[in-house]
Amino acid sequence: MKKTIFILGLLGLTIFGGLYAKRKFYDPKHRLENARTEVKKLADKEEIKNGDLIFQTSLSGQSKAIQLATKSKYSHCGLIYKDGNDFYVFEAVQPVKRTPLDKWIARGQDGKYVIKRLKNADQVLTPTTLTKMKQVGDQFKGKNYDLTFEWSDDKIYCSELIWKIYQRATGIEIGKLEKLSDFDLTNEAVKQKMKERYGDKIPTNEIVISPVAIFDSELLTTIKSN
């Protein structure tokens, strides 16, 4: 009898735990509520500033391939701006746009993120420079997401967007530029995604900048991660 009660109790806890985890991590409404609480804490503690960079593991269809090819769990990134009392992420999705920070966080895997900042941000990111960064960004607003990761301004992808904004507004290059051939293209998931995008003509000499190249830059310091 005791054994039966124990098993039933354990089963109940397992079901409850599963339902709680599903609500916490998979229910869109609850994910957004959590993200709003997180953003409020960040704002109240003044932990984020204009020009900060934010990284996450995206839930997009290409995220896994990016992670495997670049050997990093971070597959998406954006640039944080404050407008009035609200924070936004300027990002390259479809199309390039600004997204409320809470919605951006809620969209990522488990609501996890890392915020980074230039080590000398106080000297570099003056009001004039931030205005220039926004002006550079406005040139990309509304452009299509670049599925083939070409180094042109016709279309744009996430890490390319923030790299070019910083470089053109401040002269600072955050992250080492690489070629497509520098990545690990051997995994089957990566091969399949490359086949979808390029067919048999993979542009291995194409210049690229990955989220992890920016993430690992020695010019940045970590401000917050959850």
Regions found by a protein language model. Give the residues of each.
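Cysteine-nucleophile amide-bond enzymes
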Residues: 2-226
